[in-house]
Amino acid sequence: MMVTSSSIPIGQILYHDPFFFVKREIFYFFLIFLLSFILLRIPMSFWEKNSNLILIISIFLLTIVLLIGKSVHGSYRWINIGILHIQPAEICKISSFFYISNYLSRKTNEVRNNFWGFLKPITIIIIQSVLLLAEPDLGTVIVLFLTTLSVLFLSGVKIKQFFIIIFFVTLIITALVLFEPYRIKRILSFWNPWKDPFGNGYQLTQSLIALGRGHFFGQGLGNSIQKLNYLPEAHSDFIFSIIGEELGYIGCFLILLMIFFISFRAMYIGQQSFEKKQVFSGFLACSIGLWFSFQTLINIGAVTGILPTKGLTLPLISYGGSSLIVNLMAICILLRIDFEIRLSEHQAFPKGI
């Protein structure tokens, strides 16, 4: 609904078809809908056994996109295969969490008691991060590190090791910002977007105007002014601004409530998995919940001016084929984990009892 409303003007301008983007979104939705019948029948043991292979494939795609990828706004993030536009960074997220969950399910004691055991999964994330930064895609790198560190923390890593990694990651991110002029401009415009409202601060000021126009109940669905080619990426990274303008703060609250309900539900499913000794599923469910939470917080932070812009979509809401497919794939996996929990409870009781 919101993709339709926010993408009509840009679809008309770029493709002379106001419903261009929503048609593509519907296509991707039906694609994952058909795939869901397969995904829901794949046991978690399959993902656990093949997590390393999936990780290798994602790293291969991250490498290929730098060679043959399509450039959009100076970033090489998409591989075009016919009508499909694949974004390897989205695949990288879920593949990383497969790997981390598998690693922790096998080597929890090593991670807790040995610094090298703790460093191994971090090394894999660093390799992926180097490829992601070459695109460049700092937003995905931040989500990967935040989620990975949080899952490692849940696994019982020593606080000392945890803070050592946080310290070095902070130094690296600071260096990445300082050595890239466009990132410095983003930081400066984030601090005071109104100082340059028609330059570096343009996108943020237009976003804030959209949110300000919405007030509590919004201007009404379809009545946004900012989507009329004023706010860049109104249908993708900044769709939350259009939600605020059209549906008001009430609409924003309901959207956040929905996303965080899914996140907390994922964490609860993870807890149940641990209780049933399904360790891989437990770590994976927690990873998905944390991933959705962190990406949502970063997106909302960028839209409202609390954080610099990172180019991250709002999970399950923003336009984006790869993002939608991977997010719904994660939902299917959560449903499968929940199914296996219920199945184990049913099998725990003999018939007639």
Swiss-Prot record:
It is found in: Cell inner membrane. The keyword Cell membrane applies. Pathway: Cell wall biogenesis; peptidoglycan biosynthesis. It is an enzyme of class 2 (transferase). GO terms for biological process: cell wall organization; FtsZ-dependent cytokinesis; peptidoglycan biosynthetic process; regulation of cell shape. It catalyses: [GlcNAc-(1->4)-Mur2Ac(oyl-L-Ala-gamma-D-Glu-L-Lys-D-Ala-D-Ala)](n)-di-trans,octa-cis-undecaprenyl diphosphate + beta-D-GlcNAc-(1->4)-Mur2Ac(oyl-L-Ala-gamma-D-Glu-L-Lys-D-Ala-D-Ala)-di-trans,octa-cis-undecaprenyl diphosphate = [GlcNAc-(1->4)-Mur2Ac(oyl-L-Ala-gamma-D-Glu-L-Lys-D-Ala-D-Ala)](n+1)-di-trans,octa-cis-undecaprenyl diphosphate + di-trans,octa-cis-undecaprenyl diphosphate + H(+). InterPro entries: Cell_cycle_FtsW-rel_CS, FtsW, FtsW/RodA. The keyword Methyltransferase does not apply. Coiled coil: none annotated. One of its GO terms (cellular component) is cell division site. PROSITE patterns: FTSW_RODA_SPOVE. It is a multi-pass membrane protein. It comes from the Bacteria. GO terms for molecular function: lipid-linked peptidoglycan transporter activity; peptidoglycan glycosyltransferase activity. PANTHER family: CELL CYCLE PROTEIN (PTHR30474), PEPTIDOGLYCAN GLYCOSYLTRANSFERASE FTSW-RELATED (PTHR30474:SF2). Belongs to the SEDS family. FtsW subfamily. NCBIfam families: ftsW, PRK10774.1. Peptidoglycan polymerase that is essential for cell division. This is Probable peptidoglycan glycosyltransferase FtsW. The lineage of its organism: Bacteria, Pseudomonadati, Pseudomonadota, Gammaproteobacteria, Enterobacterales.
